[in-house]
A protein has these predicted regions:
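N-terminal secretory/membrane targeting signals
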Residues: 1-26
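Non-transmembrane, membrane-proximal soluble domains of secreted or membrane proteins
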Residues: 25-49, 69-266, 273-280, 297-311, ...
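Alpha-helical transmembrane segments
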Residues: 47-72
Length: 343
């Protein structure tokens, strides 16, 4: 290397290092490097074990490489080195060494597989998780709750997710909670964890499942026992009684109940509201206003976004099975008013 180029190389290296370090900044809401459950800690332990092992292998191999390059570099006037056609000892060594390294990788990996096999102690909270194109359905048999996209769990209590799919293969993944599990039609997989930190943890479908796969988000809300009990009480309460609705909200209820032509364009054909309809193709709306987001986490749950969604769902989520049925501005206003009362 010409010495006058050293400052340029140093400058490029320094800039590259700064950019690399900047890229390590946060926040990263879906980072697996900050676990908050026993499942997540098990994966983190395995990752760190293999990382340090791999780093050690890298240092040894690269050190030997640099030594050979320097020690046996070409020198002026030096004759060509003799050709070597094999060394049995070396060949045996570099065959056995990777096998030994893989043994050190395999043992903790297998241990982690058994630690995260989906089993949980008696008394765990069981939740049925059903993947749909492109949203998540959650059923709590213990409480009789059916909701969507926002998974509420209590801190410190073991939880078992029983995963399946209503259509294609999906994969439930909330990185800070733990590893992903596939949701497959006519099959049940299990994911067990005990969360130890209160907060909202983002997740995503991690198996390509169609046109709006990237828009199939989820949120895991870990709550203290008192907050979780309050959420359960709110979700098991009956929906707002009709006689307490305002005139605008009552018109929204009538729009929700209306049988349209074709019938598949009717709200009650796909959505359930306790005591009013029993649709199963779309998310249960009994307490839809209590959720923080709509459209599988794409939009904050407010009146403006509800109106956008009702006007043209496919403009927000391409491929959505919910049709744009040509609602008027007044109809949308009434429906939004009614849905916002469903807390």
């Amino acid at each position: 290397m010409h010495f006058h180029r050293v400052p340029l190389v140093a400058a490029i290296g320094s800039i590259s290092l700064v950019l690399f370090l900047v890229a390590c900044g946060g926040p990263f809401p879906q980072s697996a490097l900050h676990p908050t459950s026993d499942f997540g800690y098990a994966l983190d332990d395995l990752f760190r074990t293999i990382f340090w092992l791999a780093l050690g292998v890298f240092v040894v191999v690269e050190s030997l490489l640099v030594y050979v390059i320097v020690r046996y570099r070409a020198r002026p006037g030096q004759p060509p080195p003799p050709r070597v056609h094999g060394n049995t000892l070396l060949e045996a060594a570099w065959t056995l060494a990777p096998a030994v390294i893989l043994m050190f990788v395999a043992v903790p990996t297998i241990q982690t597989v058994f630690r995260t096999d989906g089993s949980a102690p008696e008394g765990a909270l069981e939740i049925d998780v059903i993947g749909h194109q492109w949203w998540w359905e959650y059923r709590y048999p213990e409480y009789g709750i059916v909701t969507a996209n926002e998974l509420h769990v209590p801190r410190g209590r073991p939880v078992v997710l029983k995963l399946t799919s209503a259509d294609v293969i999906h994969s439930f993944w909330a990185p800070r909670i733990g590893g992903k599990r596939d949701a497959i039609q006519r099959r049940q997989n299990r994911l067990a964890f005990t969360a130890d930190s209160v907060g909202v943890f983002m997740g995503q479908c991690a198996e390509f499942c169609g046109e709006s796969h990237a828009r199939m988000g989820l949120r895991v809300l870990v709550q203290d026992s008192s907050d979780f009990a309050a959420w359960v009480a709110a979700q098991t309460a009956p929906p707002v009684p009709e006689d307490s609705l305002t005139e605008l909200e009552r018109r929204g209820l009538e729009e929700f109940r209306e049988i349209r032509d074709p019938a598949s364009n009717s709200c009650i054909a796909c959505h359930a509201v306790q005591g009013i309809s029993a649709g199963v193709l779309g998310p249960n709306l009994t307490h839809v206003a209590s959720r923080g987001t709509i459209a599988a986490g794409m939009l904050p749950n407010d009146s403006a976004n509800l109106a956008r969604w009702l006007r043209d769902p496919k403009a927000i989520k391409p491929g959505s099975k919910m049709p744009a049925i040509g609602l008027s501005t007044d109809e949308i206003e009434a429906l939004v008013a009614y849905l916002r009362r469903l807390r």
